[in-house]
Amino acid sequence: MNNDGLPDNGGAPDQTFDDWPLKGVSAYCGALWIAALEAALAIAQTLQLKTGLETSSEQHEFGSWLEQSRSNFDKLLWNGEFYDIDAESGTPVVMADQLCGDFYARLLGLEPVVSEANSRSTLKAVKEACFDNFEGGSLGVANGLRRDGTPLDPNGTHPLEVWTGINFGIASYFQLMGEAPTAEAICSAVVNQVYSGGLQFRTPEAITAVNTFRACHYLRAMAIWGLWATHTEWQLIPGAERG
């Protein structure tokens, strides 16, 4: 309704972090929206080129939405170092997965959601705040902390948890951007927590700094295959060839 081309969060936990309210345009949902539009536009173009299906009107629609949303994403959320978690709540945290959409776009060979400079600056802030300054990097990347690595709410849930699947995705993003040592450090921390805790046959979604875990057998941990994709440029997994 506000003509910025980006989805608004309603102030309730209305996205995958379902105990973490966002208000207005958010970095997490906005970046995913832009990446989704890029994918939809590419699909429409491919369908027309490969099958002759007329998709000109869809391409025009997706393209206009994309132009509108792109022009407002940085304007509303970029703070000079990383992207604000959202445009209206004023929550002063570095959200670890704020550029999930940019990772997906780059992984799929689409137009990146943000500039390389902004991507690298954001990843640096995420590494320092949510990994290096959270338990010394021994657990993995926490979902969201203040820039100095302290919690906004010491009794918070989702912001203070390490989500295995989110971590594998973030590690893949670091690797995609040429920062393999950081990717390896994040993965090693998470895998060590899972295996040293005897959780390898019930991989949990969330691990905490007080030795608790929840949401076992969660499928988001399959994001670990993103590391294979970024490391091999989508080579087939050995033995997975189809006759």
Q: Where do the model's predicted regions map?
A:
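Short, surface-exposed recognition loops and adjoining beta-strand edges that mediate ligand/DNA contacts
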Residues: 67, 72-98
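Short, ordered beta-strand-loop transition motifs
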Residues: 1, 79, 131-135
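Hydrophobic, small-residue-rich alpha-helical packing segments that form membrane-like cores
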Residues: 2-46, 58-76
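Detector for glycine-centered tight turns/loop "hinges" at secondary-structure junctions
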Residues: 3-6, 80-82, 149, 198
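Active-site core of glycosidic bond-cleaving carbohydrate-active enzymes
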Residues: 20, 31, 35-45, 49-53, ...
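Short clusters of hydrophobic/aromatic residues that line enzyme substrate/ligand-binding pockets
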Residues: 7, 82-83, 139-142
